[in-house]
């Protein structure tokens, strides 16, 4: 469902709140649900106000920069989000988890999407992808085969990322 500057994605995952929340907030290792990026912080501990990046597995490129806005384990995680390869303004990503019959309802809301930008295109396309991968990881222990193959290509082709995404250009 989409609004002018907002997109909402929802999925039911057969798992625990803690397992889902851990996948969304783990640091120092690839997040299979989020394009296999590594959530990297300016200092240990995921807390409000902490600067963060989503980096490639090698750590050489920062794909997203942002700041933790809210963290209420295991029900809510919100952060600002700005793609380093675009000159677009930040948006806000919010994950809300709710225990329901059959598991956990996960709602991914992207707010303040800059209209008419590359960020808008990518955020509207990425929500379902992230949630479907999150579901597969929590329920089966790994992303679907197609996603795993795509991630292997990401690693092999990291050298084609724009120079502006190099982590050294985005100090924490």
Language model: regions and residue ranges:
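Beta-strand/loop substructures that line and gate deep hydrophobic ligand-binding cavities in soluble
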Residues: 80-136, 145-149
């Amino acid at each position: 469902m989409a609004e002018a500057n907002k997109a909402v994605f929802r999925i039911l995952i057969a798992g625990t709140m803690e397992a889902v929340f851990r996948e969304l907030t783990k640091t120092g290792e690839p997040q299979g649900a989020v394009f296999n990026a590594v959530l990297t912080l300016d200092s240990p501990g995921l807390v409000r106000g902490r600067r963060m990046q989503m980096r490639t597995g090698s750590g050489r490129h920062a794909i997203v920069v942002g700041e933790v806005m809210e963290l209420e384990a295991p029900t809510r995680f919100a952060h600002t989000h700005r793609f380093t390869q675009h000159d677009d303004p930040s948006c806000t990503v919010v994950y809300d988890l709710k225990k329901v019959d059959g598991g956990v309802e996960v709602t991914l809301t992207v707010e303040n999407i800059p209209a008419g930008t590359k960020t808008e295109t990518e955020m509207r396309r990425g929500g379902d992808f992230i949630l479907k991968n999150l579901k597969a990881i929590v329920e089966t222990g790994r992303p679907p085969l197609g996603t795993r193959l795509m991630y292997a290509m990401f690693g092999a082709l990291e050298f084609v990322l724009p120079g502006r995404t190099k982590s050294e250009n985005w100090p924490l």
